[in-house]
Amino acid sequence: MSTGKVVQIIGAVVDVEFPQDAVPQVYDALKITEGDLEGLVLEVQQQLGGGVVRTIAMGTSDGLRRGLNVVNTGQGIQVPVGVETLGRIMNVLGEPIDEAGPIGEKDRWSIHREAPAYAEQSMSNELLETGIKVIDLVCPFAKGGKVGLFGGAGVGKTVNMMELIRNIAIEHSGYSVFAGVGERTREGNDFYHEMNDSNVLDKVSLVYGQMNEPPGNRLRVAFTGLTMAEKFRDEGRDVLFFVDNIYRYTLAGTEVSALLGRMPSAVGYQPTLAEEMGVLQERITSTNKGSITSIQAVYVPADDLTDPSPATTFAHLDATVVLSRDIASQGIYPAIDPLDSSSRQLDPLVVGTEHYETARGVQTVLQRYKELKDIIAILGMDELSEEDKQTVSRARKIQRYLSQPFFVAEVFTGSPGKYVSLKDTIAGFKGILAGEYDDMPEQAFYMVGGIEEAIEKANKM
């Protein structure tokens, strides 16, 4: 193990000088061995020449000073993997932060790993039922696929994510890994208690690097979570990997990139944006041994889906769930836009003709209603043809029927959560399209589970 000295500190970036014949490699982990911050880990990012390496601190650099001794561990950051991590909260270095004693792991893996080779990768067309009507109908998830939840500030990404975790993790008997990347600590805390109350905590590994952490932690915490998920996958399991929020991973990369002195590219993002995203996303894949199904929340800055960060993420996903501020403002939750959301699985050969035609029928009616809105706003409903009036009436029922009470939002809505099976979802929307419920008031369809509940509600009106 070679030893060096701290020569310069600029925020989270620390330069360390080593003897010329013992310069650490890029991504090696270095440790501070003296002073107030003894044990602080630095990750090598660049070799500057003359024995000096530029590193990112995996913790606060307040209290660091020049001249401190640094030792090279000779390997990348190693984190605990395996069943011992289940039910525990860890930080980017895999250290427990839940005050429940040591992890007691039997195995540690480096967070920097190669993506599986083409020959090892596998694809599945098996659907993953979520119990959320709008998702199962319009943008069904594939087992072992990648899903993005796109939305601006405050339209419900985290609530949707928590509902998906609750529905899938409880219905799905496998293991899950949750990586909290640069989000609010309060949400991490809520999530822990939600899992505990649902009795699924012993099947979930939690890794947090939240908003208040230095950029190094936020940049690497997604890899820590992913490494734990890869271990479960390589043991032959089907794993769920949740990331909240991919945008903060990009943002941490932007901060680090600026500190490392790289020239920014479009909108101030790092020039290596596509590569950084690719390095993470290419590892989230299913192999012949097991599968990783990943669900990622993606913050959309200023509701602009063409922003480089969400636009780069789109390319890697199998299904995109787009949350709309317009739908949220109408009080329809989940505020998922059925016209903007899409999935590769929505194909008659995969989901079957009935499901495909029902989903496309719903989208056609909603699209027609969208076109008629201008006419209604200027001339009023009376000027529409009978056929268009019927379309508008059905579209408004469909819109309301796409809403659903969530289990994780029971505290806010006051109504118990509902899980709707795919079969019931298709039957309900098929009935509305066929005109079976034309005589029912549209309010009856708002915030209900299955269609029977809507009929029951209509009878009471």
Curated annotation (Swiss-Prot):
E.C. number(s) listed in UniProt: 7.1.2.2
Record membrane topology: Peripheral membrane protein
Pfam families to which the protein is assigned, alphabetical: ATP-synt_ab, ATP-synt_ab_N, ATP-synt_VA_C
Subcellular location: Cell inner membrane
Coiled coil segments of this chain: none
Protein keywords: ATP synthesis, ATP-binding, Cell inner membrane, Cell membrane, CF(1), Hydrogen ion transport, Ion transport, Membrane, Nucleotide-binding, Translocase, Transport
One GO MF term: ATP binding
Function text: Produces ATP from ADP in the presence of a proton gradient across the membrane. The catalytic sites are hosted primarily by the beta subunits.
Family stated for the protein in its record: Belongs to the ATPase alpha/beta chains family.
Known partners and oligomeric status: F-type ATPases have 2 components, CF(1) - the catalytic core - and CF(0) - the membrane proton channel. CF(1) has five subunits: alpha(3), beta(3), gamma(1), delta(1), epsilon(1). CF(0) has three main subunits: a(1), b(2) and c(9-12). The alpha and beta chains form an alternating ring which encloses part of the gamma chain. CF(1) is attached to CF(0) by a central stalk formed by the gamma and epsilon chains, while a peripheral stalk is formed by the delta and b chains.
Protein name: ATP synthase subunit beta
Gene that specifies this protein: atpD
